[in-house]
């Protein structure tokens, strides 16, 4: 039985000001904000956790950790209470393949059940799958236990509303406020119930396949998939196989500790090697939670989010597929060459801060449907209400097949400008960004 109350714990807050170059939120506990910059484009700083998630901070690279069991249990209870006020009847819980995910899943569902809310378990599933499942059921929210592209030692928790979108700042703050209260377990009669959604992966696979908009298949394609020993290890191969592609699968033996290890979208060397070895048309690398991807062409050349956005925008423009107001949303990291190439096609580019959350907000504000990040987060609101790597891959391959062009020719008009990423360690980023010397340097 759960204790009737637990000591008050420090509140969690996602730092809304600081993000690494891959869009990962730098976590903080209480009101302390993390100001440590990322060490590299693909590696978050000492306090980094998964994007949009709650977590305890990493104390050092040798002593990193997921949220504590007590924190997770209380977070589940607090979220259950707040979602109940919103009319939510159940919460779908998914996770990636980290070993700590099983521990956190148990603690989280215990807290939710103690709040009187039902739980629906789906096991290891891509983050976008949980988003889809939450929105496909009536009055059900979603929770994902993942640290995205980080190593297995880290973990985090992120919430989705019944619309499948990440919860608002206002809802987040209400959960945080509820954390300051003592846990009060509902009566035995009102306790929530836990059940497993047995056909969760099948539902999501069929949804992904339905996003192929034209009457084509991938029968002529040979594709190497690197599923990063992560959340997409089971569903991604099935999707592309059922769409007709010949597939070779890499990094699909998760053991709890090998997620993102020398594989996936943050390390594509093995994928490049296997594409050449197998004479494949493409290689596709997913990240640990399946919301980000990187392509590799037949010559093992990397195609990042900017390349993917260009191909998708060109397909929409030339084939007169709905593109809202003929514009796409990128970020401050988006290559200038993409902006110039889009302008020549009559397609506008609007930039936001780094982070798929910012991209999604701008898309909704402008009523556009396509946006993304250089890191491989691609959002297609005409098919999904969140960034989904599998759907992005389907759309990219669809555009390629329908173009009837070699990839080199399809991308030929896109001339990317050289980019250099420099991380500056500072405790006052606003002062630097507003300084005359910095503006002069950038301009």
Descriptions of predicted regions:
Residues 5-25, 31-40, 44-66:
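Low-acidity, Ser/Thr- and Arg-rich intrinsically disordered low-complexity segments
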Residues 59-60, 64-110, 114-115, 194-221, ...:
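An N-terminal, well-structured beta->alpha segment
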Residues 81, 88-154, 238-296:
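N-terminal small/polar loop signature for handling phosphorylated ligands or for N-terminal nucleophile
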Residues 129, 173-206, 210, 298-372, ...:
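Proline/glycine-rich low-complexity loops and linkers
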Residues 139-154, 275-297, 301-302, 347-388:
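Glycine-rich phosphate-binding loop
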Residues 155-276:
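Gly/Ser/Thr-enriched, mixed-charge loops and adjacent short helices
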Residues 319, 323-443:
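Phosphate-binding and adjacent anionic-ligand microenvironments
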